[in-house]
Amino acid sequence: MNKIVICILSFFLLIFSSSFFIVKEGERGIILQFGKVLRNNKQKTLVYTPGLHFKIPFFENVKILDSRIHTMDNQADRFVTKEKKDLIVDSYIKWRISDFSRYYLATGGGDFFQAEVLLKRKFSDRLRSEIGRLNVKEIVTDSRGRLTTDVLYSLNKGTINLDSTSLINVNSMNALGIEVVDVRIKQINLPLEVSDAIYNRMRAERESVARSQRSQGQEKAEKLRATADYRVSLILAEAQKKALMIKGQGEAEVAKLFLENFGQESSFYFFIRSLHAYENSFKNSNNIMLINSDNEFFKYMNTEIKN
């Protein structure tokens, strides 16, 4: 008897516990009845907000979905501009579930990773299409805001009309039950091979400028050296000229004095000349002269000094 009561109580307790479910903050719940999403009389999906809710046990199952905004990084990829130039674009998008029923059905039971795979594919296609309409200058400078705005609008609405050009796309985000909240471009770079080529060209240009400046510097240095050498030559020539003039004036003055003194004291003049001759003759101790002592050269040596 006790076992039967316990079994009955356990059964009702199981039914009672299966009749309620809790939806947490940042989540939403939908009811599946025999594998189909439960709708109201207006054929709108019943979405359960955070709180405690009732369901029919065994016949209805609850699927909890994340209602928060998600950030999805789009791996840096190569894109071609209007000018047929390649760019490496690194971007990300923010998204959230806008239609929980459609999201559940489109992603195979609310598979988050499947949703991001589909979203990345659509986002990459749309971004590629938009970049293909712009040139590099527009993308890098004033049109980055317009670019992301156009991508955001086209992802959510499916079509955009700019400059009378219609870019048609299937309502893929609506089909997934997803709303793209924001689109951002983190970084725009040139491909590595292009960057290397630009760097090499810039380096070659800088080296050419450096060589030109060094050549100009060497040319100026040569001109300065030549000018300095010329001025030195002029200064030396002028100095030598003045020295010769001074020397000539001195010799003339000496000759004048000698002539004047020679006329007055000729013996003293010859005496001085003999002393100079003695000095020059015996300057080198290795010199040997064989001269008769009665020679005129020794005239003043043989003369006795008288007080």
From Swiss-Prot:
NCBIfam families from the UniProt entry: hflC (TIGR01932)
Compartment list: Membrane
Pfam families, per the entry: Band_7
Organism, scientific name: Buchnera aphidicola subsp. Schizaphis graminum (strain Sg)
Transmembrane segments: 3-23
Name of the protein in its database record: Protein HflC
Main location (coarse class): membrane
Protein's gene: hflC
Gene3D superfamilies the UniProt entry points to: Band 7 domain
